[in-house]
Amino acid sequence: NITFDGAGNITVADPIATGSGTLTKTGSGTLTLSAANTYTGATTISAGVAAISNNTSLGTTDAATTIASGAALNVSGGVTVAEAITINGTGVSSNGAIRSTSGDNTFSGLITLGAHSEIQSDDDTLTLNVSSGNAITGTYNLKFDGSGDTTVDDPIATSSGTFTKAGSGTLLLEGTNTFTGNT
């Protein structure tokens, strides 16, 4: 298991290959992961920001990633993240628990809402495209924000939560959505 902690910024440019070990990000700083990582354990972003720019920066898809309330996953560079992810909250400074900062980025794993949450696209296009099933599930409020565009190709299957679109970017919903809360 490996933990990155502290208020400063840490950049890891070499691959992390801890086998079945976990990766945990704590502390208010930013952890930048740019390599193709091969660890198979879970990834937990407990505080601060984890910034990724490689399809497998979060390791293999064997275990999921969890983003805690007040933490964020920033994605850039035109990557496709196949990892299943649970998001909890609106991220750092309410800029999204998942934040696409640059490039056309794609999430192809299920996103589960563990709490009221926000997804933000700052630039270019963020696409949520799961090969089968729902793109987003959960029973909490969901907000899409930002000046970049977001496309959700598969169903949003949230219940009882409020669905909100904010920011100047375009939100395109292409799935047969089953959310039942207010819009």
Predicted regions and their residues:
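Beta-strand-rich extracellular passenger or scaffold domains
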Residues: 1-183
